[in-house]
Amino acid sequence: RREKFIPQIMMSARAVQDGIDLLSPLIVGPDVLSLSETVVLGTVSGDIHTIGKTLVSIMLRSAGFHVVDLGTNVPPEKFVAAARENNSHIIAISAMLTTTVTGMKKTIRALREAEESDQWHIIVGGAPVNGRFAREHNAEYAADAVETVNLALKACGIDPLPDEEL
């Protein structure tokens, strides 16, 4: 049978997170390109999933971005405040649960209603969203961490890096 129990899933997720924590300093070392741009990154309110967001953070840092990781279960106003405080032009929003799509919509709306909205590039990703969702909500969609990096580079006016350089 292909059944999985919640404790097994939780232990697996913890093991992956521990591996990421261990390997991250080796992936994002002193030799990476240094960009002046900051990316604000977080998982929307109501969602506590972190592995995908953490992988995106590592990829962005390895491409030279400074990343402000807001964590999980982040309310819309915290995304807005962090973008302002860090003078960021790129905000990456993650969700894993279909039940948190409403939270993503609220977050995008809060960012678009802010006076700085014309300066902000909003990138969305995660299981419950797609390109159509992003277009309908005036955002860009990244299917994976590499695409997130390429969209962030594009927002800075930099050509995307070939996959082997990420």
Segments and roles (model prediction):
Residues 1-90, 95-166:
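Domain-level signal for soluble alpha/beta catalytic cores
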